Amino acid sequence: MLFSEAERSLADFAEKHGIPVAETQAGKSAMPIKHPCYMGSIGVTGSSAANALAQEADVVLAIGTRLQDFTTGSRALFRAEGRKIINLNTQAFDAFKHGGLALIADAKAGLAALDKGLGDYAAPGAWQKQAAAMRKTWAAEHAAAT
C-alpha cells in the first residue's frame, strides 16, 4: 500500500464498496484514522472491531501483507468455514498464502482493476451497519482508556 502510494485509492475503494478496512502494524497510515471505514489494526495487537470483523467476514481482501501470525492471530482470525481470502501482493510467495486467491499486482493497479470488476457492488447494508457499530464501540473503548 505505502510503496504504491495507494492510500487514497484504498479509501476511495472502501467508501464506494462499503468495505471496512483494518491495517497491519507494518501498514500503519494506509488509511486515515478518522475515515468511517477504518477499523483499526488487526491481529495480536489489533482492535476489537478489526478482529471481530475479520472473524466474521466471508471474504478478506489482503493487500500487500504477508499474513504472518502476528497479523492473523496465528490464523485464528481467518478460520471461518467457507471464507475466501484474496491476496493482492507484488510477491507471489505472499500472494499464495493461506490458500487464497492470488492477485499478483501493484496495490494501486490491483485496486483499480478490482474496482472496475466490482462495478457498483457494495457490501450488504447490514454488514456496513454492523461495521459502523463495531467501530463506534471500539472508539468508545479507546477513548475511555486514554
Show the residue positions of the predicted features.
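Anionic-ligand anchoring segments at beta-strand to alpha-helix junctions in alpha/beta enzyme folds, i.e.
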Residues: 1-60
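Short charge-dense sequence patches
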Residues: 5-8, 58-68, 108-116
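Short gly/pro/ser/thr-enriched loop/turn and capping motifs at secondary-structure boundaries
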Residues: 27-32, 68-69, 92-96, 111
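Aromatic-residue hotspot detector
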Residues: 31, 78-79, 114
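Phosphate/diphosphate-binding loops
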Residues: 43-94
